[in-house]
Amino acid sequence: RPPGFSPFRIY
């Protein structure tokens, strides 16, 4: 997972 990964923002 990248350092800016957020489970609330999945593209």
UniProtKB/Swiss-Prot annotation:
Q: Where in the cell is it found?
A: Secreted
| GO annotation (BP), single | defense response
Supply the alphabetized keyword list: Amphibian defense peptide, G-protein coupled receptor impairing toxin, Secreted, Sulfation, Toxin, Vasoactive, Vasodilator
Per the record, residues carrying Sulfotyrosine are: Y11
Q: Which GO terms describe its molecular function?
A: toxin activity
- Keyword Metal-binding belongs to the record: no
Describe its function: May produce in vitro relaxation of rat arterial smooth muscle and constriction of intestinal smooth muscle. May target bradykinin receptors (BDKRB).
Q: Which family does it belong to?
A: Belongs to the bradykinin-related peptide family.
Protein name listed in UniProt: Phyllokinin
